[in-house]
Amino acid sequence: MTYDLICVGAGPTGLACAMEAKRAGLRPLVVDKGCLCNSLFHYPANMLFFTTAEKMEIGGLPMAISADKPTRVEALKYYRKATEHYDLDLRLFETVEGLERANGAFRVRTRRENGAREEHHATRVIIASGYYDLPRPLGVPGESLPHVSHYFTEAHPFWRRQVVVIGAGNSAAEAALELFRAGACVTLVHRGERVKRTVKYWVLPDIENRIAAGEVKAEFNTLVTRIEPGQVVLRSTNGAAAAERLLPADFVFALTGYNPDFAFLRAQGIELDPQTQKPAVNPETLETNVPGLYVAGVVVGGQHTSEIFIENGRFHGKQIIASLH
């Protein structure tokens, strides 16, 4: 079977692309190496989204919730129901290993979770693979130790433990607060001089007040130079000759952001800007330099992952499908 298009990624953007395709009378296939909305599933268990429900809706379907902003659980339920409504053709837990284009169509090579290889064919492909799978590495010794993670899920296991949170954005601030409220001894470490101003408006004063009260410790203008069992090694950014010092750490959360899979994009022949890693696209159609190959969602922004969210990436499907007529 040859599909009209294959969407690589079953997050909100990939689903929105497939829904727009079905509304236009096309036959789409959605492929994802994880579960439906895999990134959202791996968000912190108690996460509350920054944006309101109507700005997360896809396929023209309302998100009916009791509060203004959806929780992670409510968002996952909505996207399941929306997918069922459109009866999308999905291949979950199936990894895309590569694409080949010949005679005006694509051959998409995949590997299922049992190791079996498959091929799917389509006249067009949309890469909407997100970015949450690839943390931005600190690049310091000890980063791969078992007590270090780039993902925070919930705080309970860390009650009365010494926890270091590296970063000062939304993820780091929310993790630090949740850990503090669960009884952990938390220290926030950030190379900048303060918590980022882009932190959610209801979280920012909370974390700043906890720091001011000494309930969450903070090491600003500070770098982690290496991680060791039971401790991290810190160095101040104020002066090249600053002495290193030790900070106890039973667990370390390095919440310093994530990147799209640039290597995968390059492997498909997509040209990336050497500075920003933004893919070369037609801004009107989101078609890349490879004919018939499109990008959607946060992938469009390259390293500037804060430019595109669910609330604006969800419209990329309309933009792409409209260009096909």
Regions found by a protein language model. Give the residues of each.
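Beta1/beta-strand and adjacent pyrophosphate-binding region of the FAD-binding site
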Residues: M1-T13, R161-G169
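Active-site acidic short loop of glycosyltransferases
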Residues: T2-Y3, H121-T123, R160, P229, ...
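Beta1-alpha1 glycine-rich phosphate/pyrophosphate-binding loop at the start
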Residues: Y3, A10-L88, A173-Y201, D273-Q275
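Glycine-rich, N-terminal phosphate-binding loop of Rossmann-like dinucleotide-binding domains
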Residues: A10, S129-G130, T256-G257
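A Rossmann-like FAD-binding core segment of flavoenzymes
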Residues: D87-A122, R181-T276
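Predominantly flavin-linked oxidoreductase catalytic cores and closely associated redox partners
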Residues: R101-G104, G115-L188, G192-V203
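FAD-site-proximal beta/loop scaffold in flavoenzymes
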Residues: E143-P157, Y258-E307
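A conserved FAD-binding loop/helix module that cradles the flavin
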Residues: A296-H325
